[in-house]
């Protein structure tokens, strides 16, 4: 066994686990139905498409701000995600964006990192779920 792989007769490397993060997303289909009822099919699809594009851009922007350690602007960007996600029924994404802003407010940088990257995972899955639910093509 190579050096560093065994500890007290126990093969450490053989015991390494990979944690797979799989987040459940929650979509409020009633919000989407209400949007379609209010705006009609064409109007609602336009709103949903623009919201999805904006969410994708802002998620990327949030990650960039975190890497630059720009907490005030990260907070603003995360807050902006809440309203957009709520508008099209992405309840999980909106809640995690609230968690990011809360972690920033209490200066808990470990929590900011954890919740931000949870937001990235949920954001990606939420965007995919809305595309699939609406049967939209990119």
List the model feature ranges, each with a label.
Residues 2-76, 80-138:
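Two-component system phosphorelay core
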């Amino acid at each position: 066994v190579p050096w560093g792989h065994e500890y007290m007769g126990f093969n450490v490397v053989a015991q390494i686990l990979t944690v797979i993060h799989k987040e459940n997303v929650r979509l409020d289909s009633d919000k989407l139905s209400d949007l379609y009822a209010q705006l009609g099919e064409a109007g609602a699809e336009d709103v949903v498409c623009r919201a999805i594009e904006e969410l994708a851009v802002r998620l990327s922007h949030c990650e960039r701000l975190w890497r630059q350690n720009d907490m005030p602007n990260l907070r603003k960007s995360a807050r902006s995600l809440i309203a957009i996600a709520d508008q099209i029924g992405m309840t999980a994404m909106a809640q995690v964006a609230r968690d990011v802003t809360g972690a920033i407010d209490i200066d808990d940088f470990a929590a900011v990192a954890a919740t931000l990257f949870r937001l990235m995972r949920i954001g990606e899955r939420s965007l995919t779920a809305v595309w699939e639910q609406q049967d939209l093509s990119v």
